[in-house]
Amino acid sequence: MSDIDRGLFERVLPARIRGSYAAKFNVLLLVVVIIVAAAGGYIHLQTQSTVGENTERRVSGIAEQQAATLHDWLTQKESTTTFLASNIGGDAVRTSDVKPQLERQLATLQQDVRAIHVVSTSQDTVVASTDDARSGTTLQAGDAPWLSTIEDGTTDVSVSDPYEVDDSPVVAMTAPTDKPGWVLVMTMSLAQHSQSFNSPIATGDVKVVNGDGVITLDNRNRALLEQYTDTAGNVPAAVATARSGQTVYNTEPERTGMDDGRYATAYTPVAGTDWVLTYHVPRGQAYALQSEVTQNLAGLVVVALVGLLLVGLTVGRRTSSALDELAGVAAAIADGDLDTTIPDTDRTDELGQLVGAFGEMQTYLTTAASQADALADQNFDADVLDEDLPGAFGASLSQMHTRLEALITDLDEAREDAEQTRKDAEEARAASERLNERLERRAAEYSDEMAAAAAGDLTRRLDEDVDSEPMQDIAEAFNDMMGDVEATLAQVRSIADAVDAASTDVSTSAAEIRSASDQVSESVQDISADADQQRDRLGTVGDEVTSLSATVEEIAASADDVAETVNQAATESERGQELGEDAVAELERIEATADSAVERVTALEEAVDAIGDVTGVITDIAEQTNMLALNANIEAARADKSGDGFAVVADEVKDLADEVKESATEIETLVDDVQADVADTVADMSELGDRVDAGSETIEAALAALDDIGDQVEAANGSVQSISDATDEQAASTEEVVTMIDEVTDLSDRTATESQQVSAAAEEQAASVSEVAGRADDLDDQVSTLNDLLDQFDARAASADTDEN
């Protein structure tokens, strides 16, 4: 599998990790842990930011709401002050009537209104007051800080700085009445009003700081009229910033009158005044939601990590161990160890199915290997061959089994036919030997008779009652010749002694030629039964030569026919040799075909080895598929929250499924190749049978050619007979007879060479032929002498004729 075919996760891993499912599983768990932790951190940061913004908006909103409420309260009090001042009459008002009026009005006001005074600015005295202790008193600047706020001729309501009255912090509002020189003063309890702040957050702390940095209002009444400072004793800069019209939000330490700790604080201005309202909420309370979300998120992350750890220790570890065992089994099978033990499992999931598939594959391969071994050993009765192998591969093995059985049956039949042919040839050779023995005996008798005739006993005759027509023809011709010889004995008496001496030498040579011919006949018995007749004809030629007579010239003419016939016999012998070479070539081609069959079987074995490699690929893909299937289950459980992760894993599973499909295609192609190799092997075996048949036909053709050689030898025998009948022409052709004898000698040599392939007697025949050649030379000398004598005889005959004429 190339890098292109692997997933991104597989390509980025080092080779050491890719080779181990456990390592990849642990890396994946680590990646998931990192992703979960990163997601938790991101959610935490997002929550912190969101909660921080919400907290800021909430705290600032509460501060602004409280400031608006305070502004409404001040506006209401100013309106009340103006209303009360307007109810004080003009110049006709009596002092005694003012106090009751003020008391009636105080009774209608809120409880935070402490007292109402009417002050004469010209006399700095209290004209009337709801506080009896104040009525008719002269005001001092220390007792009435609001005096500084009264300005003659102003119609506006003024608000004094906070101060204490009887240890109670108050603030006063002044407004001029309709009576000139009189001013209405209404004092309000800051402690009473501070309690009116309604904080939505129970732990919220509301403080109002005036322009001097003094705490004017405090909902907890713990620091009224104290300086509002930070831990360093300084007024926070945020107060001045808020006084300029901005709402400021900070997380800062405690301020005056607050418990230690950090607070979420909002500073906001109070409209129409130089006051600043501050709202403090303990940070833990303000960010309680953030803390809760963080805790819940941390708990979720911990649960997820623990779950992943448990999955890794249980499912992942068990799966890794099982896959390691399967990988070992697959490696053993790929190495040819089909007896390796596949671990048992009671799992019914994909891993259990994979283990079962390995078992089935092991059984399949074991059966296929056993059947292949049985076929290789030609053990066609093996029980394993009866087992059914599914698929094209099993069908190919079955077909090969059938064809091999048929081929071996054909080979056995061909072997039996060849054995029968050999037996027939041996019987034919035996019959030929028996015939040859009879002919040899008859030839010996003829030789004795001819030798006697050659010695001068012209009364000898040959027995014409023989079972061989050529021998019968020879006997008849000899008897006729001897009659002619007796008739002409008187004419050739003058040269009878010389002819007798020459005939004796020729007879001796002829005997030697006959002996050599006998050896040649014995050497070529495996070639043809009729080869023996050739030896007989050559013996006859020797005998006929001893019977030289007046017909020598006719013998020379017939010698041409003998040479031609013997040449034809030599040609047929050469043709037999060529056919023998063709038979050898056919056997070589048969051997080449067998080599090709061996190569096909070797290719079949290599294809079986390639099936082990594909099994390794299927093992790797199974490991990855199992791991990604586990991840898919984990992601599926979280699909309601993280559907994208499940989609990624699903894509990985799909990619691996495609890879499995490609590997399956590769296996199918490989099996097709194996089937093709098996088909080629069967074809080669068929071709081997054809070659054997062709070899048999070639051998039969060689035997037929050898039969033709026998026929040609018979023709040569006929020519020799013609030589016997035409001895009167021998005188004119003596030199040609010598030449023909040399050619016959050469032909005998070639016949001996061919006979060496059949029998060890070829060397003896060659030696005999050489001896015959030597004897032929001696005969040539004698014939030369005879020619001289005959020339003299012819001359004498011609002279006699002349005299007679």
Curated annotation (Swiss-Prot):
Disruption phenotype: Mutants completely lose the chemotactic response towards leucine, isoleucine, valine, methionine and cysteine, but they still respond to arginine. It is found in: Cell membrane. Its main location: membrane. GO terms for cellular component: plasma membrane. This is Transducer protein BasT. The gene is basT. Residues 516-526 have a biased composition (Polar residues). Interacts with CheA, CheY, CheW1 and CheW2.
